[in-house]
Design a protein with these regions (language model features):
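Basic/polar, acidic-poor N-terminal "presequence/leader" segments
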Residues: 1-30
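Non-catalytic DNA-binding core/recognition domains of DNA-processing enzymes
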Residues: 24-109
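Short, charged hinge/linker segments at domain and secondary-structure junctions
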Residues: 48-57, 111-132
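Flexible interdomain linker/hinge and immediately adjacent N-terminus
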Residues: 59-64, 121-146, 154
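Structural detector for short beta-strands of small beta-barrel domains
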Residues: 140-171
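OB-fold (S1/OB) nucleic-acid-binding surfaces
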Residues: 166-188
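Short nucleic-acid-contacting surface segments enriched for D/E, G, S/T with interspersed K/R
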Residues: 189-206
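OB-fold/S1-family single-stranded nucleic acid-binding modules
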Residues: 208-224
Length: 224
């Protein structure tokens, strides 16, 4: 079983030093950015630790200065699935880099024996390399579509997060998470959207019912 006295902060520094030796300046800058964002996430969310422990430890230290590298990959799902798409204002390049860098970090942790098994974390990061930029592309497409096609008159309005339940070319069927029972649709969207998005992605926005059926009124987030 891997053991070390190093903290997460020390291991992040070692990881970046190793990457700087092999990467060009532009690529290394992306690594620094993603590790900085990941460190900010860890300090804010303390994955795997409860509020009581958080209160006790923050009196005398930080998450990354307290815990060791075996704690790092526990935050991957929340970092890649929530923090990056919801809390970080960034483009597709940074989203792709988030998956690339965290995947490299997970493999590096296993190679260095700082973590025992990082296969699941590597797979989660691999998915993020594809899905996060794709979700941003869908958001951009829907933003443009809504700007041009948002209805002015409607009878019913649902502001919520919506699971994508069914996809056909140019059409989505959506399931509101909290505000409505059942699936609504078809909701017309650009065909490119239905080529890129996947079932069970989360669309945050407003859907309204018009005389011609359900339509998107606002879209503010798309999350894989």
């Amino acid at each position: 079983m891997p053991t070390t006295d190093k903290t997460i902060s020390q291991v992040f520094e070692e990881f970046l030093n190793d990457q700087e030796a092999r990467l060009g300046p532009n690529t290394f800058s992306k690594y620094q950015t993603i590790i900085g964002l990941f460190e900010s996430y860890l300090e804010s969310y303390w994955p795997g630790h409860d509020q009581e422990e958080y209160n006790r430890l923050t009196e005398g230290g930080t998450f990354c200065g307290t815990f060791g590298p075996e704690e790092i990959t526990a935050g991957y799902s929340e970092f890649l699935g929530y923090f990056i798409p919801h809390k970080v204002m960034c483009g597709k390049d940074t989203m792709k880099a988030a998956g690339t860098v965290t995947r490299k970090l997970a493999k590096w942790l296993a190679d260095k024996r700082y973590a025992e098994d990082t296969a699941d974390a590597q797979e989660r990061a691999k998915e993020a390399v594809k899905d996060l930029p794709a979700a941003q592309e869908v958001l951009d497409l829907l933003d443009d579509f809504v700007d041009m096609n948002a209805p002015e008159k409607y009878d019913d309005e649902i502001e919520d997060h919506f699971w994508i339940k069914k996809i056909e070319p140019g059409k989505l069927w959506l399931e509101p998470l909290t505000m409505h029972d059942g699936t609504i649709g078809p909701v017309p969207v650009p065909k490119k959207v239905t080529q890129v998005c996947e079932e069970m992605w989360d669309i945050g926005g407003v859907v309204v019912k018009t005389k011609r059926g359900w339509r998107l009124l606002e879209v503010w987030k798309v999350t894989p």
